[in-house]
């Protein structure tokens, strides 16, 4: 059983705070962040957890909490999100070098360290795959769901590459999803997510049996 005090869909809703914290003066946003932290300290874990596996959600723009709720209703707890303006990346420290303005430091940081799929160099692509693999390892995820909004060409190509490279090079199962910006095919998506959860459960059972026999 997987228990948690904070589910991925709540993180998706809270990403409004995440976005504001990047552009809002600290004195305005800190009270809300402290309030969220205190709430988590006293919150009890779910009495009857519905989650059977852990997944990382990666992909293009996603500001629809219902999409994450749909994933979690199928038994997959979203333990980390890595989409265009999700929780990850974006929390790394930006160094202001000597003689550099804050604006220039921010611009340099995003140009040099961006993990946006618009950067097509092989080294940048490899770095993005490794980043997702590292996040999955850190949060003990069983697999990755990679989504792209229809007509988002950058993530359409990236999603195909992730589907091949993450399982082959990092041993991470991937569920590849193309979706509308507004979710209108919940029935089809639910079937895909349920099948993915079942495949992850089978993989975990096989690994346990292999460990016993080994």
Predicted features and spans:
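Active-site loops and adjacent core secondary-structure elements that bind or stabilize anionic groups
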Residues: 11-12
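Short, structured coil segments at secondary-structure junctions
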Residues: 7, 74, 169-172
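Single conserved hydrophobic/aromatic residue that forms the stacking wall/gate
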Residues: 1-8
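Glycine-rich phosphate-binding "P-loop"
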Residues: 16-39
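Acidic, glycine-rich loop-and-beta core segments that form the ion-binding/anion-interacting portion
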Residues: 31-65, 72-74
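Proline-aspartate-enriched helix->loop->beta-strand connector
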Residues: 136, 140-146
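Redox- and metal-dependent alpha/beta enzyme cores, enriched for Fe-S-associated oxidoreductases
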Residues: 59-124, 128-133
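Peripheral docking tails and interdomain loops at the edges
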Residues: 155, 160-214
